Amino acid sequence: MSESGNTTSMPGCGRMCALRSTWSKRAFLVACKDGALTSDGRCPQYGCGALVSITKGVQQPKKTASAKVVKCLCWVQPARWCEKHSKGPASPNGSVTTKRSNSARAAPAPLPYKKQTCDVVVTVGPLELVYPALVSEELPTPVAATPTKVEEVPIPELPLWLAPAWMVEQPYAATPEVLCLTQREEFALLKKRLTRKGKLLQRRATHARFEARAALARVRAATQRKVEEVTALVIKGRRILAAHQLLRELEEVAPLSQAQEQLVASSCAAAAARQEECASFLRRAKAWRKSISATPPVAFATAVASKVVSATMPWAHLGLSLGGLLAVPTLDGTLGAKQWNAKTIATWVLKPVVSCVQSVHAKVRDWLHSQPEVGVTNTKVPLVLPEVCLGVLSPPSLSEEIVDNPQETSQSGIWHPEMGVRNIYVFHDDSWETSPEEDENYTYTFSRQCGIPYLLVEGRGAEERKNTILGWDFSLHNDGEFEFLPSPEEGYTKELVTPVALEEEDKYSTASSCGFFSLDDVSSAITIQCPGLLSADADVHFFDGPGYRCSSRPRDFRPPVVRGCDYESRVKASIQRKIENPLQERFITVLREKRKKNKKKEFHSFSACFAFKRKQIQWPPTPNEMVNEWEEYCIAQAWLPFEVVVTDEIEDVTPLYPGGRDYNCNSQLLFPLAPLSTVYCDDSCFHPNDGWTTDGNGKHFRLSPQFVLPDVPIPIVHRVTRQLPQFLYDLGIGDLTCNSGYQAENLQEEIQERMEDRSEEKPVPSLDTLISKLSKRSTKVKGAGENRYADRHSLTEKAIFHQPGALSRMRSGKEKTIVAANHNSDQISVRMAECGKPVFTPLPRMSDEMLRKFLEKGLGSTSTVALDIGIQSHIPQGMPTVAFVNVMDTRIEDPLYSSLCGSYIDLGRDRAKTLCLPLVNFPMSKLAEDVDDVLNGLMLCTHFQDSTKFGVGKPAFQYGTLEFQEFKPSAYSDFSRVRDNWDAIAKQQNTPNDRILAGFSVLGAVSQAYNQALPVFKSVELVAPPKRKPVVATFQNPTTLGRSNTTRSFRMPTMDLPRSTGRDAPIPIVHRRNNNDVHGFDEATPARFSTCDSGLVADTTLAFAKMYQCKKDAKAGHVLATIDIQECVFEDNRRVALDWLAHGLASFKYDLQLTVDSNPFVGVTLGITVDAFDRLLPQISDEVIAVPLAFQLPTYLFPISKKGTFTQTIDFAAIAGYNFFPHVAAFGRPKIIVYIVSDNDLPASDTWMCLVELHMTRLESSTLACSPTLVLPQAFGGDLPLDLWRGPYTFPLGGGTKRLSTSLDIGTSTTTVSGWRTVSFPAAYALFLQGHGGSLVGEVVHTGSAAVSCALHLCISFGGAPPTLEEALVFPGFRLPSGEGKFHIKVQTPYGRLSTLTPDCALYVYLAGGPIAVAPMSVPYQFCIHLERLVDDGAPPRTIGLIREFNWATINNFKSDDITFAIPARLSDLVLTCGDVTMSTNPLALLIGSCGFFRGNLTVVLEWATFLKAGDKEGTVQLTTCRGMINNVKGVRNAIQKKVVNLSLVGSVSRYLNVGDFTGFAQSGGQVGYDEIFLEFSTNKAKQIRYLNINVELDENFELYGRTIIPLKNTAPAFASTSASAPNES
């Protein structure tokens, strides 16, 4: 402000700038309002923006002499800015800067002020500024004043500790300098403090959460430790109980029969005598040797040996021929191996045995030749062929006589008895001076080298049988464990490889001595395997003996050297064989480990599954538990009882010694009571020659599992990451799943369901202690079945989706796949509904806001991968209530495919949960219909089955859903995070190929299959796409407007618009997004034969039109027209005929239109019957057909009393099951028969006409067959389709008849008035059901005159006297007030269902009112009943549909012995002259006769019974599979397969056949003139056959096509028949 107070302006942007003018305050406001200045007082010119300064004049103070100049203005500004009192000027932010010069800063203008006479305190923020008074107001000192006397009062002194706080002098504390902050700085400090406070609160909350989690983890760990302790106790208890149970079962004794006891007693006596004889012979031999020790040597004579005819061993009757080991031609060098079963013993077992035997013979011969005093017969050991070793030769029959006299061998005049397989070689040698104990060293025994197969029966005998091998293993002096390989070929050089080198290489695997042996170089294998036997020294070793006393010869531990060969290929082949049989490899590995521990070789370890041979052992029983193997091995000898070894059919075997003593023998497996890992038997109880031992329980044989291994099948168990038990007695207890059932009856089952199996840690003291500990534990256990805590977090995204890796994160941002787990619903209630009625509730997939966000991100589709549904039942626990919850796709109209996956939920278990995989994708767009699909595309359908009568409409349960979704940006996105392996999702569930993966309280599941068969893609007609724009009109010479003189208005000239403006051409739209052009509101096909678009559209679908006439007094059954479908189309050669010729084999659909003038009084009803296989034409005589016979086929009724034009759509593909070819018939000529159903109530005045039109609405090229009508074995779906008509029935005027009935024996034949019996396809189909319950659905059609009317009441009654109308009104029924209409009646019987073969249950029709007619009328009320179907009410019907084998025919009373006849493979009737044929009448036979054609596979089984006696071997039967014509005169045929059996020994023969000719299908009558497959039966003793039954066994998916009838003569009724033309009247 200036001193003068005038308004000045700062220089502006130029001379015209507004800032150069003078502004007053008012003028300034006006300028801002008018826009001359901006609102903030700046120049509005571009590039200027100068600010206007307005100064205001103030009143100057008057100048007085006493006015003083202000010396300092420090009080006006902060002290730090003062130039006088501060060291230097400071900036507002507090930083000291350099001192400013006075010139740089203008002096502030002095302000007027008053004299300050007091101190002024100014508070600025936290500061208090005190300004002292500028003018003193002290009073002047009085001049003559007398000083007053002042009395000083002494102040009492207080100690410091008694003084108050305000009296205590406080030291002065230097207060730091307080800075004056601006508002921005204060706000910044405040924000900083708030931020620090918020972070502090967050850290505290985080620490609190961490501490809570740590505490929870500690609690869980403690709980888990307790659970594991209890689990260990439970497992120990289970094992103890299982072991005790197993021992109790093993201790059970199976009683022996008398014949078995006699055989055991006689065998024991024979063995004792044999042992005594052996001991006597040894004593004589030793005595003789001592007597001749001093005599000179005597030369040997020629050795004479005789074959042992029958050994004295207890197994002699089994057909084994055991001989000695002398080198004579009569020697059985195989030791009975030629009688073995080749299917049981492997080749590699027999080859070394035979080679060892031959080598021993050679060694004995060489040793005898080395003795000069010993003479040896010059004989050669016969070579044993492999065919003999493998048991190709048939075993001999059972010995009738048992020879107990041992044969003797003469050598040097001394006879030596030959006892069993033991041969003692005595040599005449002076140097032989040994002790009697050394006799056994020169005894070669092979009793432990031959494995003998037997049928063993476990001690529990009645439970099951097991196949194993009783035998003895090798005991060779060899410590090396490797595989023997043959010599290399000539010219092949390679580095020598030793077994030690093989073991050092990782790619090779060594085998034990019981591994595979080479078949090409047996001698080299024996050389390495038996080095002691083939050595040149005289120290002969033995193979068997007590204690394995082989200390006479030191063992050679040097690794044997094998000649070089192609080890790489040989060893790899050996490894491959072991991989193919891992069970054998595992046994070899265990055996190798046991041998390293210097265990006895005969004490081989064997797995428990070998001893029991059981695929499934469960204790306690659990669902879906199967034991695959046990890795705990028994280190003990197992002994088998003698009577088990012999045979299980012991009653048919002659005892060795009749009348022998009774010997009580135990028939059980002997297991030691001590732990199996520490107890094993000694050799002292085993006799090396006999191979058996005696104890208090009987005689037992030692068991070796060595030969069992190669042939034991390995059971395959389908498990998903399943950990099986690793101990022996844990029989079938594995990890629990949420599918485990809840059974509270047994505490052990509850323990098993709640606890997981773990390894044994601590023993359990007693079962009472275990129960008491379990009663104190928590009720919520991880993984439990009933009390499982199923919250929304039980399944995580990691279990469903892959986590993206580093490479996935580096992908382009455009290709991103999002996954989410949305908890969409939580408390959706489902209310109880009636049985059979569905309840639809939503399954929301996401919210509208979530969908909007996904659309903004550019996502294009969403997939529902997994759906976790948790259910909280409101039904009281334990109640029998089941709900079927089904996830359905609302976009699919067919309920069969709309149902994705469903589960049967037990609502009496409080909680339930199911995890399913819908695997459905929805598009995401902004269209309204697509948005609805995304949000509500899935729906939950619930059906209830309640026996408690829970209130309908009451909430039954609540459910919540957790949905795992995957979102993709586009259809081109190949990146998916869904796990490909569903096992990772299923985890411990055993359903890798099912959409229902988990669940508890779930009784069962139903889901769509992943791999469903694809349908046949039918032919389509390709058309060009529609135009996107309408027709564009162009103007060549446009009209121009001339300029008018006036501009006020002008007139448009007349315009002659052309007619072809294109307005008639519609704008093309896409109707339903799939169809062709749409003209107007109707679809139209462009004209094919027209040259101009005239707008006239002809009816191109008309295929046939013809006028027929009817007599005025036509009766029921009169045939008006018989239309041949394949010929009528070509009568006029319309467009339909040409299209059919172009398509060839085609599928079509007709609209049949009948035009008759409507007349309500005549009372004529027309019937139309479709005969697709030409079965009714032979039954039409004199243009009359039996109406009940026509009612068995698809029929439609048209009463002319209602209207004059009738239209009915007929789908021939659905009725006939096949498609048609023009002119030529395939399986039949389809016909449409039009006839009169009921008589005229009133005769017409004259003949009347009827127009029949056929419009072909569909014509498509197709294959021969359509969908099958029925597939066997048939899985009944619940509804039984009938489509049968009954009637016509009449109620006469006057109320004479008040009740009519028709029986519901649907499966019976129908007897017509012409004496024919007919069986329809629905009746034959009903024969597969013994009974059916539910409701009957049908319709009553009025067929008479409209002048007569009445009211009807319908009900169903079972057995007893027919109910009256008053009683029927109490039953569940249906009222028809107009006398016609549809009805739905519940079937009530004492058994819950009705029989399809007996007339006990009937449908009763009562006259509820009427009939009423006008006075001249005297006709009755006529009607027909249409039985549509039987609807199941939930109870499963009694069915025989699972039976596959049916009898087709029986032949007896053959005329001659040599007969030959053919059996067609098309299930036709047999007409034979060689015997009497009786064709069976069963459901299969009636279905074959009542269907059009069929195909599939079957097995023809021929069984016969003869007049021959047992043992007669007469006659043969030959069954030949042929191809050709059965009735061919020349007999030209091709024999494909032949089979010949004995007539008396074999009672049946079968052959697998494919039903069908060159078309792939077959008819019972066959195709005339074409080859077919048939069986030819021939025999030369036909008169000896009493009965010959021909049975057929259907294979899976045997298909039947088409529907027709079987017209049979009424000779022998097949079932209880009813008359359809004469109903029961009362």
Curated annotation (Swiss-Prot):
InterPro entries registered for this protein in UniProt: Nepo_coat, Nepo_coat_C, Nepo_coat_N, Viral_coat
MF terms in GO: structural molecule activity
Source domain of life: Viruses
Pfam families (alphabetical): Nepo_coat (PF03391), Nepo_coat_C (PF03688), Nepo_coat_N (PF03689)
Keyword Nucleotide-binding: no
Transmembrane residue ranges: none
Record's comment on post-translational modification: Specific enzymatic cleavages in vivo by the P1 encoded 3C-like protease yield mature proteins.
Keywords carried by this UniProt record: Capsid protein, Host cell junction, Transport, Viral movement protein, Virion
Biased composition (Polar residues): 92-104
Coiled coil location: none
Region of interest: Disordered: 84-107, 1042-1066
Alphabetical list of Gene3D superfamilies matching this protein: 2.60.120.20
GO biological process, one term: transport of virus in host, cell to cell
Cellular component GO terms held in the UniProt record: host cell plasmodesma; viral capsid
Other facts noted in the record for this chain: Virions are comprised of 60 copies of the coat protein.
Similarity comment: family membership: Belongs to the nepoviruses RNA2 polyprotein family.
Protein known as: RNA2 polyprotein
Organism, scientific name: Blackcurrant reversion association virus
